[in-house]
Amino acid sequence: VLIIAVLFLTACQLTTAVTSSRGEQKHRALRSTDKKFKVALLCSPPGSYCFGPAACCSNFCSTLSDVCQESWSG
């Protein structure tokens, strides 16, 4: 009876460990997509006002019109 109880408790601990590690993986995945979303919000899309290339998602800010460009047009 003691051996069965020990095996049962060991199985419960292993099941709990596997379940909690899966939960952590899901949370890690959510955190990484959250970071990407926040970075996307920090840059300005093409056609919007910019104050330097770092402000634009494309890294191209027209110095004449202060507007984000899709790409550099020579």
Swiss-Prot record:
InterPro entries in UniProt: Conotoxin
Compartments, record wording:
Secreted
Q: Which residues form the signal peptide?
A: 1-17
Alphabetic keyword roster: Amidation, Disulfide bond, Knottin, Secreted, Signal, Toxin
Q: List the disulfide bonds.
A: C43-C57, C50-C61, C56-C68
Name the residues of the propeptide: 18-38
Molecular-function annotations in GO: ion channel inhibitor activity; toxin activity
Q: In which tissues is it expressed?
A: Expressed by the venom duct.
Serine amide-modified residues are S73
Its Gene Ontology cellular component terms are:
extracellular region
Q: Fill in the domain comment.
A: The presence of a 'disulfide through disulfide knot' structurally defines this protein as a knottin. The cysteine framework is VI/VII (C-C-CC-C-C).
The entry assigns this protein to a family as follows: Belongs to the conotoxin O1 superfamily.
Q: What is this protein called?
A: Conotoxin AbVIA
Taxonomy, top ranks, is: Eukaryota, Metazoa, Spiralia, Lophotrochozoa, Mollusca
